[in-house]
């Protein structure tokens, strides 16, 4: 039987990493599965893995962005130089390890999950290997992506995008005559929470994600601040950690939101679920998304979702008016207004919460498994 190998950057917390673990748990029901993780991060795997899934790590060295930034901010030239050298060493080591690993695999199915690794698989992958490349983000018409699609993906058997729209776009950039097939396979939920009484949810908005610029949590704070005068009894909880934490803490203070906004830090999957079950609304203000896993989780917990309608992502999940609201990207006043409409209408919010839970079932493992079967076999 063919072995499925999945190449991951790491298995710590993150939407891509959760999707990888979910895929492995699905595939291992029918195939031998191995996850090849470039980095061996602390507390990884962060998400449950079937005991039959093998995990192999390529490097002991880990990325050192946190230490590098600390040295830069602290104006410590010796530490900065040391961390810069270490960063280059880690980067070069990663590139060598990925290329060596892809060259070493001569049978079965190999799935890469990052654009730069997809290019290596296309170029160096053994013809006897069934080569599948996943793209987990919106390419945003970035020239690096477009050039890769046009000139670097022809050696792949299948390219997996997360939405039909992204698949249509990428399909037109793959050269005519190439064997490469482009398909759409969404993320899926392995687990559905135990029912929580919708009537007992608190006057709380929740948002989850890495505290990095592309998640746009600064935009969420601006929007939430506009609701405070009319709804001082509502709170906002942002779950996650990351490089923007200090900036967000400063912004919370500047906006006078210290008594209403909590940055919880990173929580376990069970902790995230508990936050979602107790909240009444989910808020997303990302600058870009691929197929937001976190929106599926929010729907499954009975959370109507309010999101900026960025190019792709939220629109692939949210059904406007039924289980959420899409707001023109960047329109703070409109976003705050939509939040307040739902804050003020308990009956509508509860109906949307029920619809959200029903919609989440469309992304069960059983429903997506059939799509994957058409991808895994020639």
Language-model features: locations:
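A short, well-ordered alpha-helix in the C-terminal region of glycosyltransferases
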Residues: 334, 341, 348-362, 370-374
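Aromatic "clamp/platform" in nucleotide-sugar-dependent glycosyltransferases that forms part
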Residues: 287
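Short alpha-helical donor nucleotide-sugar binding micro-motif in glycosyltransferases
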Residues: 266-267, 274-279
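Donor nucleotide-sugar binding/catalytic pocket of nucleotide-sugar-dependent glycosyltransferases
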Residues: 132-140, 154-194
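A conserved mid-protein helix/loop that constitutes part of the nucleotide-sugar donor-binding site
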Residues: 14-22, 203, 207-229, 236, ...
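Short hydrophobic beta-strand element within catalytic cores of glycosyltransferases
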Residues: 304-308
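Nucleotide-activated donor-binding/catalytic signature segment of Leloir-type glycosyltransferases, i.e.
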Residues: 249-267
């Amino acid at each position: 039987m063919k072995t499925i190998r999945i190449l991951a950057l790491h298995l710590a917390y993150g939407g891509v990493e959760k999707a990888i673990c979910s895929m492995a748990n699905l595939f291992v029901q029918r195939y031998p599965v191995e996850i090849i993780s470039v980095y061996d991060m602390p507390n990884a795997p962060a998400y449950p893995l079937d005991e039959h899934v093998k995990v192999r790590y390529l490097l002991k060295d880990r990325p050192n962005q946190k230490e590098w930034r600390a040295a830069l901010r602290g104006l410590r030239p010796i530490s900065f130089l040391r961390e810069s050298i270490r960063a280059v060493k880690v980067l070069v080591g990663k590139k060598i390890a990925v290329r060596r690993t892809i060259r070493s695999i001569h049978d079965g199915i190999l799935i890469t999950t990052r654009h730069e690794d997809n290019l290596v698989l296309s170029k160096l992958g053994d013809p006897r290997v069934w080569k599948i490349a996943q793209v987990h983000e919106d390419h945003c018409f970035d020239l690096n992506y477009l050039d890769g699609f046009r000139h670097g993906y022809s050696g792949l058997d299948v390219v997996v995008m997360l939405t039909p729209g992204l698949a249509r776009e990428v399909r037109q950039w793959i050269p005519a005559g190439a064997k490469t097939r482009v398909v759409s396979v969404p993320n899926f939920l392995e687990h559905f929470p135990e029912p929580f009484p919708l009537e007992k949810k608190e006057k709380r908005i929740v948002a989850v994600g890495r505290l990095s610029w592309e998640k746009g949590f600064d935009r969420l704070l601006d929007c939430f601040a506009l609701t405070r005068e009319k709804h001082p009894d509502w709170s906002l909880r942002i779950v996650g950690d990351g490089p923007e934490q200090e900036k967000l803490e400063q912004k919370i203070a500047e906006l006078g939101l210290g008594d209403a906004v909590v940055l919880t830090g990173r929580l376990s999957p069970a902790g995230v679920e508990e936050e979602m079950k107790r909240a009444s609304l989910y808020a997303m203000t990302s600058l870009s998304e691929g197929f937001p896993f976190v929106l599926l989780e929010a729907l499954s917990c009975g959370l109507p979702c309010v999101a900026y309608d960025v190019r792709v992502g939220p629109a692939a999940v949210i059904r406007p008016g039924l289980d959420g609201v899409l707001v023109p990207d960047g329109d703070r006043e409109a976003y705050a207004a939509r939040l307040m409409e739902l804050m003020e209408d308990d009956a509508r919010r509860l109906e949307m919460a029920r619809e959200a839970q029903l919609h989440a079932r469309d992304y069960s493992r059983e429903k997506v498994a059939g799509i994957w079967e058409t991808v895994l076999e020639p």
